[in-house]
Amino acid sequence: VYKEMPDSPYMQEPYLGTYYYLLNTLVPPTDNLNVRKALSMAVDRDKLNATVLKGTNISAYSITPPDTLGYYPPKLFSYDPDRARELLAEAGYPNGEGWPGLELTYNTSEDHRKIAVALQQMWKDVLNIDVALTNQEWKVYLDSVTNMHFQIARRGWIGDYVDPNNFL
């Protein structure tokens, strides 16, 4: 209602939080740095936001949201499908050959499912790898993540206060 009023006091700021995927570095194949980099570089975050999330979010390139007290994180792993394929080949899986499989775990939510499906498709299209999706109810999901029973898990961090240190 306020948003539609002339001279409205309504103001909307970006969400002080980041949703991301946690990769378990203790189990293969995500124990390999090149695999982790390849997975990251094979994700078109801007396309994901524009299509799956209908432009309602800011693409995350860092755990710290942009403009958190003037902090602008660098885009360390931008979308780079060619480099992603090179890194996967360096890890021993050229064009996805010999890929041992991978499982992405997320908690029950239609948006989480849509994002997981989009990632699964991007990884298939760019890297030619298969990724299984596992949906878990909240308590089961928390137990899986707490006990490190996952390869990739959906995570999030919501800031307690507006300062980049809150995300470190």
Predicted regions, residues:
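Extracellular/periplasmic catalytic domains that process cell-envelope and extracellular macromolecules
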Residues: 3, 14-16, 95-98, 146-148, ...
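Residues at the C-termini of beta-strands that transition into short coil/loop
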Residues: 14-16, 67, 137, 156
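Periplasmic binding protein-like
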Residues: 9, 122-168
